[in-house]
């Protein structure tokens, strides 16, 4: 089943990897859109709709993976892990979209720099996840990408804690404080979800070793 701690697969099941590559690509695309909005929040409604459109594409890719799973007798790795990986990747995109939506819902037109910093970390995590997913098919070194996602999540924790502490120290408007605190928390959850996806990838590799 494996060689060198990586997954071997039946060529007829390559469609799974194509769908996972598509889904992970949407993660990176959505995260980059979010980062751009937070760095320069013009035309909020239109640009947040673009993130939502990517999130819908991710939902369709996730559904396609689950449909393929239900139709397949032979799979490249455990059925449960295929479901977990699809769901965990989709979760990252869901929370990326949720963060973008907070900007419109709460009319946050001047997000703090820490928000774009967190979004930048999400972009890096999504890029690492995409590389890790691609290497499942190519028998490559998945683990280093999982480890980097986890390191980035630790960094995001520090950024989020500092940002929230700064809010409580400096923000005098309690309503604005609540809105920005929630934005930071949703962004931080997105980084947590990326770590969850990396942990699923790692488990797949370890089971195949």
Segments predicted by a language model, with ranges:
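Cytosolic, long alpha-helical scaffolding segments
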Residues: 1-209
């Amino acid at each position: 089943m494996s060689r060198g701690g990586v997954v071997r697969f039946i060529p007829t099941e390559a469609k799974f990897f194509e769908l996972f590559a598509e889904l992970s690509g949407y993660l990176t695309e959505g995260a980059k859109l979010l980062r751009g909005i937070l760095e320069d929040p013009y035309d909020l409604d239109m640009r947040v709709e673009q993130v939502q459109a990517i999130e819908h594409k991710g939902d369709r890719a996730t559904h396609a993976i689950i449909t393929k799973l239900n139709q397949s007798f032979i799979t490249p790795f455990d059925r449960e892990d295929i479901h977990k990986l699809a769901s965990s990747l989709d979760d990252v995109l869901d929370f990326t979209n949720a963060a973008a939506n907070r900007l419109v819902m709460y009319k946050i037109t001047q997000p703090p720099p820490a928000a774009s910093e967190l979004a930048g970390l999400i972009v890096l995590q999504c890029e690492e996840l995409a590389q890790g997913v691609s290497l499942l098919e190519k028998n490559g070194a998945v683990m280093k990408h999982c480890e980097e996602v986890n390191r980035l999540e630790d960094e995001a924790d520090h950024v989020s804690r500092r940002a929230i502490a700064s809010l409580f120290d400096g923000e005098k408007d309690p309503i604005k404080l609540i809105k920005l605190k929630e934005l930071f928390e949703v962004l931080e959850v997105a980084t947590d979800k990326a770590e969850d996806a990396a942990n699923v990838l790692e488990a797949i590799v370890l089971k195949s070793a």
